[in-house]
Structure formats: structure tokens, C-alpha cells
């Protein structure tokens, strides 16, 4: 019978579709969907359990309850298919039509749809240009609204209270019409002529001056245009007919004990039907107005509750005081349709179990318990058993498997061979959380996992569980084997480094083997080959750490694959010689001839992958692991309490620190330092004491003195187990050893502040009660943090994935010449990240020239691999322009050249790769390692921030960047520009260090001078801000009147007097308008000019400036005319960790943002107002000047008369990304966000490639604001997708019309996700109601471009292996041919086929 049904299945086929459109349903459309009107609130008959007629489960409307059987039982069986029973009116067909047939309710009075009423901004309100409150008062029958004023003085849409209405009736009689309720709103909406409104508003727009009014009209215009273009009619926002959901989607399930469980929707529908029927009866009876009104209001409320319960007023609750789940609740939220059933489904053929170690497995294998395998591969086993003739029927096969006869196991072995399974560990934070393995059958019940893949899964064996999934189809097996096999995922997609690096015991074993010791057994022997070494080791002639000489044979592999062998003698140890046996051919012996810590091993694997490729690396990684386990066992490393050696110096160091603290305490009590300073200093003292103790401890641990062969004492690296574990990177760190053998150190309170009494004891000595309490205090905070962090990190990842999910590589090369300028990252003089690491795997955007010549070193469009990077480094190139996804020109995707290398594969990225998701996972996955805390900058850092000089670390030459300077009387340079930087260049022209130097810095060296390491080359006063003279002459005071604009103050200690300019607020009224200044005059008494300009040398003095010179005093170039004291910058918290990353990606505005210059020009200060000063910038080309009000308390970086460039910092603070984009452009904002995000991750030692952050930034920059519409169909001030505007502009330019101009906009990731073109994707992310309301009103069509939309509608995603399928479809839709659908048979053909089959079956009896 099952086979027969196949013929009938083809009746209802899903049409191929290319998009999904959402719109408003008209009453006629709703009626056309419906199969009948639901008139009664009954559900099923309580005795017969049959559905009531015309009720909510009526079989006549919705279809039969049993397959091919009418309700009264007159027609049963297949042969009556399609007949409608004359007794009960039920069509004989399959039950599943009850999942798709809808009904309807004819409403006795129209009802407003709550989504279009209450979802802000209210669409109905915007359409009618009325406030939401007014409309609600009409809808809920509190006031009348005028619909047709006629010849009266009333206006259309005017609100009338009951009294007003009665007065108007008396006055005008029936000349006017006013109504209440949804009917009134319906008539108002129906009366709107969309086209006329649009024309009126478009004419009105240009003449409007008020900003708010323009915004309001633009909003309304957009809405009306959306209606007009989509063909929706405004009156459809009011329901006249209510559709009824098919009954099987709101089932009534019998529980045991005769009770029923029902879906909340049934209650809600029942309520609507009851009220509707009562209203019909009242209308028939012509009941009094007030009763009818009340009933209509109740109907409106019950429909509201059905559509979106709790949106207005209190939510309707069921019998158990729980709000009922309405239609809107069904689709939104984590438990809603989108996230629960469409994006995350449960799958069949899966199992889960605890994992244990499989140290004997190969990298591509996993151990699968026989029991699990038998269950998972059942259908395959049945098939095999039947195929081999061991079982006659499936039923027999089933019996065999249940009895577990021996043949079954042989078959299972066969089935499993070369059939990969997928292992997944939750939480799956990145794509390496699911990998494929070949199963190996094992006894027991735990899955065995290869130790090297633990890092990718972040798994350990303390009870973690993993899930197994079986890829069933051939295609799935192929993908699992070729793409997801653990051996194909050696490199991490986040940073391109090996992710299958050994850890813990393996590292310890390899490290132990490769160490050397003085005077080991067999030291100084020389061996002819590695085989001999092994023999000596096995026969115990030579110890594993002994230093020996040995002849090694190395294979070099040339570019073309030719192999040459060479031999040489190396100094090494027995252990390293043994390790080199597993080294693949083609790698140098030097790679193992060193202490093999975790970093070295990782580098070794990386080199192996780059030089020899995947296969050798996989084999090598396995061998390394086996060797590591073996030698770790041999080493017998263990930890005893005596391994934690406490340094003798500890006690004196602690005593010294305590004495210092006492001294500060005394200073505090005598009032010399403030409480804050005392606290900071105390913490500093303890922090440095802690450092010293741990230094002494590590020095003590790390070396030991032994007797060498000559009988003399010699220092050697210690073989202390704890030290070895930390040094090799196997487990633990100096910070942890410090707590065991040094001192526990400072602890933090739960709020993050540091407790000033540290724990001076360590764990070996033991803690006393108060120390123990403080310890637990901090530890508990750590646990609470971790729990919060996980949730926050997961949410960040979800937002990132959502914003980037539809970004896919869709073409080879977009041909752009744009790119980002890459320089080495230098912080405080150290190169944090050399240029090589930043450009590796990128494509060059413009030819790189050899320094000092015109010769092209790296041609454009070269993919920089390791070899090219070597060339770049040799030629000491310190900046280059590389392609980036941010500047990629491809529409709706990116090109391979702008992305560069696929980090996980090491070649240029393939088309169809979902780079957006990879980027989001790479940024989100380490999120759990980031801290949650904001860092309190305590003493140490605040002291560092008040630096006052630059001390060089390397030899080199001095170079200045964007610096203006003058030479003072003693021949030193004085910097007179802001944001100047000073760099040190080595002899090859590479930049080694770079420092920011403030205005007024005095340089000890001239530009291009040689500097030595450790020299101090620049000084400045961190506490005051000088005003430097740029010419020599005499001082002339302007507007400097004692007691009016300035005062004289005498210093008590030195007796010197100085002039202090008064703040505007303190001056008498005569001085309010005066502008105190210093003017420089020459010997002839005329004003001097600033060199090279026509600007007189006049320096305006702000309030509180201190002038050291007197009137008419001579002055030299570079001397300070005045000093402005700087308030000591308050120690402010810097947000760090996860919250900082989230803030950057959400593009949040900082609390006190830096103020940037909006234009280039000259600064002057206009009239001051209360609490604010007016900053005026006059452009050099004489354009309109720009004014801005700035609060007085902001510290300004600029003086009157100074020139600024657009985007320069005027007042310090955190820079807002929006400002950087507006004033400095897209590349600068990209650099800013990339560097800021990287700073957070770098602090935690996490490496992420810049590319991933750039991908997210590209998505944040997707939208733009139209500044001038030109001849396009956009509106000025409208937000649009950049790709759309570019495409439109290309068309306009081709026609010779004026294109639209636009300004890029930066959106935070949440906003950007909600602003995508695809409403399905946005609705499944957040704010489902709002997204769907907006989409419906605009009649939006979702083209199913992204990944998420396709997952939701159940198709292959347009990325990876599904990419070509989508390419083919798109090409066909473009040319107009249809993809071949499944063969469709008409019902009559199917019936014929069936009859034939039945005859055959019948004749074979």
C-alpha cells in the first residue's frame, strides 16, 4: 500500500519560486482563501468527539478527520476520492488538508488591525495624519470623528466628543456625517486619494523650512508611496473578514482522563466568534446604540487579543492566569516559529554520548560505540542484510538486528567502512565545532575523540558530551569527507594558524625530550647516523638529554618538486635526534634542534603545512602526538610540594614594601597627599613588590647549578617539573606559579576595585583566615562573571552572524584600485604587529615600488604569500595599499581579490564561500575568553599617562611626521603643531618605533640625526600647555589691563611674580568683551607676521593662562610666551573586554565624545554664552564660516588663529566612529574600528585576522543617506542600500542623466541587521512585529538572496556547494527558462496508474 501512495503524492506540488512577497490581504482575498465561514464557537462534540458543524473544527469547511473517509462514514476508501458526501458535506480526501485549508469569520462590524494601529509609528495614524491617541479614542468608541463635513464649518477628520456631536446635530441637522469606531476610520481611509496626496506633498516639500515638519512629511510621503507602489489599499488595514487558521495548526489533543489540551488560539477564536454572533443578534434586534457600541468595542478588543495579545491593555489570560499565546507570539522570540522550528531543527539519525580520549586513533578517526553504530546505521544494515540474502524481508532483518546475531556485526563493519560521521560539541561557536570522522567500532559506551581536535571543539574529558550525526545521502557523505573531515581543517579560519596543535601532556613530552642537560650520560659522543643514536639510547649508553654530535641527512624540495639530499654534522641531543625521525622529508633538522615548547611546535606544524602541504602535515601531527605521549610517560614528570621553591628574598621584599606603605600613611596623615593619591601609591608599591617577588622566584626556579664533566660548577636550565610545565606551555603560567611559591598578591572586590592590603602569603605557606576570605571573595566574582560572559558573548555572536550572514564571495575580481593603506602597528615605541603579518594573504591594490626607485617590486593584483612577504620585508617597505572588502565594488557580495586568501585553506578564496558567517564566528568565538570588566586605571597607569619625554629603544634615524617646528635660540627644534609623530627608522628604512609628541615639545636632535638606543630625544611639560612664539621680537600686550582682564600673582616660595589672565566669568563687566592677547612687534614698532604668511603674530590668551614675560620684553623664536595649566586628567575607567567590542560594533556614541573640526580653516572664538563658548572656523577659501557651541569645561586643543584640517581633534575625548566617517572618510573609520577591536583581543592574546573585522564593517556601511536625488527615484534624506544607489547611478549615467549623490552611513550591527533588504532575515532576528508590519505595508518582496532566508524557506543556501545551484537558477530566471520541476502527473493519470497497479496486484493472487 505504501508504494501505491507514491502515485498520489504528486498531486500537490510546490511551485518553484524566486521570491516571497508580503502584503495586506483584502477582504475578497481572504474570502477566496477560505473554504467556508465559521459561524459557531463550538469545537468538538463532547460525546462523539466528532467536530461540530460550522464550528472551529468543522469537517465540512476544513476537510475530513480520517484519511479518505467522510464524517458520517457513507464514503470510505480511495475509490471515492474527491467525492463530496451529500449527507455531511465533507469532501473525501486526505486528512492533511486540515493543515492547509482556511476558514473565515464575517465580522458584523469592521475592526482595526492592531499591528497597523499600535506598532510604532502607527501606520493608520500616519496615513490619516492623526495622532494615535485620537484614533484609539475613535476606535474604542470614546469620541466621534467627522467623515463628511458637507456645507458646515466642521473639518474632515475633526474629533467630536459626545456633547459636541449632539450640539452639532442640533445646529446642522443631517448636513454632516460623523461616526465612531472602525467604520469611521475605514471610511476616512477609503476616502484618501493616494496619487493626489503624493503630488501635493512632493510639491510642498521644497518650500518647508522647519526640520521637524519636513521629517514628518517625508515619513508620511514614504508610507503613502509604499502603499501606492505596492498596490495595497489603505482601507485594508481595517479588517472586515477575519481569516481562521487551519485546525491542525491549532490542535485539540485528547489527554488521558477524558480532558483535552487545546491551543490558546482556539480560546481566542471562540471569544471573537461569540462576540461577533452576539453583535449580529443585537444589530438584528436594533438594540440601543450604547449596547451595540459596547459590543463592537469588545469585538475590537477580542480581535486585538487574537492577533497580538497584550499589545494594548492587559493581556487576556486563560484559566491558569497565564496570558494566552496569540498569533504574533507564535512567530516571535526564541520559542517562536522562526528561531525554534525554521532556523533550528532537530535531526534524525543522531545520538549523543560522553567522550573519552582516543590516543591511539589517527587524526581522521573517532571511536564509535558498537551499540550506537548499530542504532544509527539501522536502515543501511537492513538493506545490506537483505541484499546479501541473509534476510528475506525487512521484518526478518529487523529481528536479526534485535537479536544481535554475529552476522550483523560483519555487516555493520561493511556499512561503516568509509562512511564518515559528524561529531558536534555544543556550544558550536565556530565551524570547527562540527567535524567529520571515519568511525572505528569500539566496545564500551563512550565516544573516543582524537586528542588533537580537542582544541577546535574546546572539549575536555571531564564529562563533556558530544553528538553524532550520520550524513545519509551520497552528496552529504561526499561533502563530509571532502570539506568537513578533521584532516581538512588543520588551520583556523580566524587567523590561519594551525588549530590542531598538541597541548598539555604531548607538549610536555616533546619538551622534555628536546631539553639538554650538562654532563648527561654519553655526553660528547659522535654518531654516524640517527639509527646509531637510537641504538645507544635503547642500550642505555646515552641518556636522552645528553649533548652529542650526529650526522643528519636532510632533503631539500625545490619549487618544481625536485628533491636533493645533503648531509651535515650537527650539535644536538639524543632526544632531538630521536624526534627528528618523525620529521617529514623536506623539513630542516634545525626545526627540532631547539627546546620544543608549544609555540615552537605550532610553528613547526605551520612550516610543514606551508612547505609540504596537507597530507604530510596530518601524518606528522599524528606522529608528534604519539611521540609526545610516549616521552611524557618516560619522563615521569610529577609535582611534589618541594617543587614549589619559595625564594629567600621574598621576606625582605615584603618587609621593604610594608615600610614604604607606612611612610605614605604618615604623609597622608600629615596632609601631604590626598586619600586618592595614597590609595594609588599603596597599590603601586604592592604591585611592584609582587613583580619583584615573582622575578626572584622565577629566577630561582628556572636554573640550577650542576657539576659538569670537568668537575666545575655550571648553571643550567632547571628540570623542576613545575617550571618545565610552565616553560613548555603545557599547563600553568608564571602568574600561577607566583601564587604557589611567591605571593598571592592584590585581590579585587566584586565591584572591581582593588583591596589595598595584598595577600603576602602563598599557597605553599598557606593562608590565614582573613587572607582566605579575601581570596574566596575574588574567586566568587570570577564565577559570576563567567556565567554572564557566556550569555553576552553568545548574543554578540548572534548579532554578528545576523548582520553578515548574506555576504558571500560572488566574483573573481571587481577591478577596483581602492584599498586600505597598511602600516606596521606601533604602540608606545614597540612594533606590535609588523607589516608582514598585516598584509600576508592580501592582494596588492596598487604597484609597490622599490624604495627610492621607480622599479615595480610587487605588481598590482599579486596575492601576497609567505615568499612575497619575505621580499617586502627584505626591501623594508613600510606601507602599501592592499585590497579590502571595505572598498570592494561588487554589488550584493564581495570579490575574491578584495578578500584575498582563504585563511583556513591557504589559497585565494573560492567563489561561493560564506565569508560573512566565517567572520562573525571568528570574532564571536573568542568572545568567551574576553573579560567583562572595565579597567580602573589606578596609579601605575595614570603615572604613565603623564609622560614627559621620549626615550628611544633602537639605533636609527629620527623622522618627523606631519610636524611643524621652529628652531629656538639654542638651536633645538620646538614643535608647533598638534598630532605630530616622531619615528625612528633603521638603516634599511624600516620604521622601528613611533611616538606621539604634543605641541611645545623640545627636541634634542634634528630631523635625520642618528640616535642611539636609550637616548632621550624629546621633552615636554605634561602639566602645562605652552604657547610658543614663532618669530623673534618684542612683546606687546593687547587688552591686558590689571584688575580687568588679568591679575598679578606672586609665588610664595620663589617670590617671582607672574601675570594670570582672568576667566571671562570672573572679570568685571568692562572686561567681558575684551580679548587679551600678546602681539609681537619688530624693532620699528610694527606688527610682525608669522613666517610665510600674511597673518600677524598675535596670540590670544585663554582664561587662566600664565604669562611669564612683561610688556615690551624681548622674545626669541621657540620661547614660551605663556603657559596654560592643564587640569590633571582624572583617572577614568576604560571599558575593556566584551562590552568594548560590542560598543564598537554597535557604533555607540561615547559619553563625552571628542569634538572634531567640521571644516578646514582658521579658528577664532565668537561671543560666549552662559556655560558655552562659540567656536568659529573660517575656511581659507573664504567660504561661509562654521560655528559650534562648546561647553566651557571641555579642554580645547586649539588656540585662536590656529589653522585646523577637517577632522582634526579640537577637544579631547573618545572619538565617535560616526564623526570619523563623516569628517575623515571611510578608510579612516575602518582603521579606527579594526585597531580598537584588535586592541581588546590582543590584550587577551587572541589572534584574529583584520579581514574578519573589515567584513563586519562593510556590513555596517551598507546604507547611505541620499544628499541629492538627481534624476533618480530616491528622495533626498532617504536611507538607501549603497549597492542599490550605485546600480541606479550606473543606469542614469548610461542615459546621460544626473546621478544621485549620497553620504555613507555607519549603522550598528543590530540596526544594520534590521535594515537588510530581506524582511524574512530581519524578522527572524529581532522586533518581528515591527519588521513584518513595515514589510507588509510596503508590499515588500524578498528575493531570497541571503543565507538565512533560504534556510527558513528550506532550500540550499546560496553559498558553498549550494552556490552553483543558485547561480544556475539565477541565470535561468534571467533568460526566462524554468528549471525542470519534478515530473507532475495529473490526478486522472495517477488514477489510471493506480488502477493498473491494483489489477496487477489482484491478478497475482
From Swiss-Prot:
It comes from the Bacteria. InterPro entries: DNA-dir_RpoC_beta_prime, DNA-dir_RpoC_beta_prime_bact, RNA_pol_asu, RNA_pol_N, RNA_pol_Rpb1_1, RNA_pol_Rpb1_3, RNA_pol_Rpb1_3_sf, RNA_pol_Rpb1_4. CDD domains: RNAP_beta'_C, RNAP_beta'_N. Mg(2+) binds at residues 460, 462, 464. Keywords: DNA-directed RNA polymerase, Magnesium, Metal-binding, Nucleotidyltransferase, Transcription, Transferase, Zinc. The keyword Electron transport does not apply. Pfam families: RNA_pol_Rpb1_1, RNA_pol_Rpb1_2, RNA_pol_Rpb1_3, RNA_pol_Rpb1_4, RNA_pol_Rpb1_5. The keyword Transferase applies. Gene3D superfamilies: 1.10.132.30, 1.10.150.390, 1.10.1790.20, 1.10.40.90, 2.40.40.20, 2.40.50.100, RNA polymerase II, clamp domain, RNA polymerase Rpb1, domain 3. It catalyses: RNA(n) + a ribonucleoside 5'-triphosphate = RNA(n+1) + diphosphate. Zn(2+) 2 binds at residues 814, 888, 895, 898. Its cofactor is Mg(2+); Zn(2+). GO terms for cellular component: DNA-directed RNA polymerase complex. Zn(2+) 1 binds at residues 70, 72, 85, 88. Signal peptide: none annotated. GO terms for molecular function: DNA binding; DNA-directed RNA polymerase activity; magnesium ion binding; zinc ion binding. One of its GO terms (biological process) is DNA-templated transcription. Its EC number is 2.7.7.6. Binds 1 Mg(2+) ion per subunit. HAMAP family: RNApol_bact_RpoC. DNA-dependent RNA polymerase catalyzes the transcription of DNA into RNA using the four ribonucleoside triphosphates as substrates. The RNAP catalytic core consists of 2 alpha, 1 beta, 1 beta' and 1 omega subunit. When a sigma factor is associated with the core the holoenzyme is formed, which can initiate transcription. Belongs to the RNA polymerase beta' chain family. NCBIfam families: rpoC_TIGR (TIGR02386). This is DNA-directed RNA polymerase subunit beta'.
